[in-house]
Amino acid sequence: MTLEGFGFRQKETNAVRAAGAVLAYTEDNLKCGTGHIRRISLKSRDEFLLIDPSSRRNLELADPMLGSAKDSTLLHVLDCSKTPMGGRLLRQWVLNPLRNVERIVERQDIVGTFKDDPLTLAELRETISGIRDLARITTKLNMNTANPRDLISLSSSLSLIPGVRNILAIFDLPLIADINTRLCELGELTGRILNTLIDSPPASATDGGVIREGCSPELDELRSAATEGRNWVAQLQSKEQERTGIKSLKVHYNRVFGFYIEVTKSNLENVPDDYIRKQTLVNCERFITPELKEMESKIMGADEKAKALEIKLFEDLRSYAATFTSEIQQNAEALAEIDALCALADCASRYSYCRPHVDDSDTLIIRGGRHPVLDAAMRDSRFIPNDTVLDGEDNRMMIITGPNMAGKSTYIRQTALLVIMAQMGSFIPADSAVIGVADKIFTRVGAADDISRGQSTFMVEMLETANILNNATPKSLIILDEIGRGTSTFDGLSIAWSVAEYILDHPTCRARTQFATHYHELTELAMVRRGVKNYNVAVREYGDQIIFLRQIVPGAADKSYGIHVAKLAGLPSEVILRAKEILANLEENAIGEANLPSVTISREKRGRYRAKNGGPPQPKPAILQPSLFD
């Protein structure tokens, strides 16, 4: 299929070829074609901050990771939109932040203006809240699946546009003016819908009772005929009761027999000769009369003709509405943009966000930054803010060490999320910030094996790391958490060190990087490489207990406190005590004096041996230690 009608040359790019294939498939498989697809635009990757799929997943931008709650995503925090179109657009903005500083600043200007005028913002959001999903309604119009309620929703939504335009006219901003000019009021369409359909129609036109009285003289006549017939039938019951003397006589209707007269068994001797028996039941019999049958034909005929005419009138209205597809779609896009910007302004006001300064530099300075998801979830308690300083020279890489559970991973994720928010045009949870736009964001956070592809946890980790090293640029932001932990200590440390060196030294990389690790040896990079700074997550020790302060401070940590975390997790006390003993042995010497691994010898036994024999134990075959519970 050619897309030349959309302004593309044949086989211009692979993306154009793919779009043509999708459009051809859609036309072949949709019953009513693709008339609602009026525009196809080619977007350059250079326009947007690229976030690879694993980073989108690790950062939980729009979808929670397996086992996480739905409110753990960035989109959940930002999406307080009032329309379905606005919600979908916000999702696109979260997944595809901008790189163009001018466009980012345009959005920031509107968010800031709305934030500073809360009364007008509230009025605008209240007006927008009544607008239905115009994009979906347009699709249904062109597929001939829109029902009467869809058209009423369309009419009520279009009727709110003049109010939206009046509110927007207050603001003197170029982007708002552009959005306002794109809004079409479509009073002719709104009027025709209101003059044709009743205010609360049934879901389907085939149910009847859809068209407003006075819309069609022919329909009014048919309805009048049917109504008169039903009135005649209603009067027939009292008339026949008086004629026959049967007070319990009833006139009913069902779809099988139509109208009928029902007489109980005890009154059958009073049935007139002109009654024709149709059905015998246990307690009664049902009859018809020639007069009743004739009136039934008139009523049913009028009803059927009225329903058929209603369906035709509705389909004509639906086809007429479909001729406004371009204008309705234009309204949907403009309203979605306003709704998304209002949502960002509402979040900025609700959570006390600041406006970041965004430019094309390599600077990334965040003062008092907060994790947006945790900050929103912890409204009743204080989230500990932290600073971030990265640039392309003296602060190119942050090596972050510290205890397990102290908040290293949260902190480095926070940095990526704040950059994404800033490049969306959103305000961010911080005291102040200078954000030099990034071209790509990469994260290597967490890992799990991929059984379906036969890949181990470490293989997945290395594949993600390879993707980062092969695609990062000096304008990228890299977030690394525990590189090399999926293999042996020496292998892992060697890989982590060489990865850090590659990022720092390779001319095509040299990206701003945050590197969280438990390999304390990596902190020595700061001694031999320019641009590396060591930071740690502060803790406070009280005897055998530690308190996590959640504060990022300069310098390297000297402990990981893994045994403390194991204790918090509820490991048996025997395991904790033995772990402390093994750790002490390992820290003293990796290999015991008798060429036995020091892990297998307790310090108490070693001390007793020395006291008894006056020297270290002599070499002898290794003996496996018994279980803790033997």
Where are the regions that the model predicts?
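Secondary-structure capping and boundary motifs in well-ordered enzyme cores
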Residues: 70, 82, 103, 123-133, ...
